[in-house]
């Protein structure tokens, strides 16, 4: 049967080396179980490298260049200082696995301006390392300006995470346009990451035809693109026992979003925090979302402020569960429990 073709890898992989490389790299592009030089050399031609890595560099200018069809991530500045990416174009097929346009990881003092990104995965993505490795490195991505960029296809227009274990802070995003990205503004992480994301300011964003959320906070991220994961899988992870807060607990706080216009979306907004570490102190104001299939859903959040929000949808505009100190156009809801509450703006 056609559905069985992928499982019969020994038939359609071109060589034994390519099959071995694929099996060794189930965890993205990190080979597992490779112990000798001979084993490494056998699978090396079949790995998918990043197209451009810039590592531990200072005063970098990347300007006026076009990149196409990267095997994996396209642009990956890592641990750089004073880096400017200006008037760059990235074109990856929509189906390219892990085909991120830009992954700015653990960089300091960066300008991302006047670019066009068309990606097979996240477009403009802020990262700082994954799990224990990222926490040990301890290099937050910080002091970043993202301005006047256009994103065509992508899993997210502007994204933080999910690899944010070293922290993210002092990020300013303004005057960007997202045309048909799966999600507009996307914040994602999961238990085990650790790290703190704070001091994010987003202003003046225009979006058109967003299939899923215009704004998404998901701390139960399961490694799949928006829309690919079954609702049952997400609910299953959310029903697991609540662990203690440790260094492995990610935290998202002090995030301020304003002047957002979106014409066409799936769910307008989704705040999905952790029971042990809710999303805290997020302000969203001056937002217009037309033709949304669903409204706003908030779960596990504290100190969220919604002000001057206009959402055009057929159902309830605001569905809230497990939230504290929610402020909607000046009215404060000190506590809403698991039973939930339907509200309107």
Ranges and model annotations:
Residues 3-345:
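Extracellular/periplasmic carbohydrate-active domains that bind, remodel
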């Amino acid at each position: 049967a056609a559905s069985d073709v992928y499982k019969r890898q020994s038939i359609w992989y071109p060589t034994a080396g390519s099959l071995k490389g694929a099996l060794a790299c189930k965890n993205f592009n990190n080979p597992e179980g490779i112990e000798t030089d001979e084993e490494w050399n056998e699978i090396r031609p079949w790995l998918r490298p990043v197209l451009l890595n810039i590592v531990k560099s200072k005063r970098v200018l990347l300007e006026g260049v076009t990149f196409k069809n990267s095997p994996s991530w396209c642009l990956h500045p890592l641990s750089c200082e004073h880096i400017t990416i200006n008037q760059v174009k990235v074109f990856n097929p929509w189906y390219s696995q892990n085909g991120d346009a830009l992954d700015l990881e653990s960089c300091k003092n960066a300008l991302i301006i006047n670019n066009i990104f068309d990606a097979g995965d996240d477009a403009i993505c802020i990262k700082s390392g994954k799990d224990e490795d990222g926490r040990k490195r301890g290099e937050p991505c910080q002091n970043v300006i993202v301005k006047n960029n256009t994103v065509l296809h992508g899993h997210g227009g502007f994204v933080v995470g999910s690899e944010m274990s070293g922290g993210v802070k002092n990020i300013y995003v303004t005057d960007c346009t997202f045309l048909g990205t799966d999600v507009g503004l996307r914040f994602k992480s999961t238990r085990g990451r650790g790290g703190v994301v704070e001091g994010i300011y987003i202003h003046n964003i225009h979006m058109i035809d967003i299939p899923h959320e215009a704004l998404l906070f998901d701390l139960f991220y399961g490694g799949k693109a928006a829309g690919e994961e079954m609702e049952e899988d997400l609910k299953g992870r959310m029903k697991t026992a609540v662990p203690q807060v440790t260094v492995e607990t990610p935290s998202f706080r002090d995030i301020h979003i304003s002047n957002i216009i979106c014409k066409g979306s799936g769910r307008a907004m989704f705040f999905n925090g952790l029971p042990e570490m809710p999303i805290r102190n997020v302000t969203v104001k001056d937002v217009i979302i037309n033709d949304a299939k669903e409204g706003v859903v908030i779960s596990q959040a504290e100190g969220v402020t919604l002000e001057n929000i206009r959402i055009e949808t057929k159902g309830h505009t605001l569905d809230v569960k497990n939230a504290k100190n929610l402020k909607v156009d000046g009215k404060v809801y000190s506590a809403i429990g698991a039973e939930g509450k339907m509200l309107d703006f």
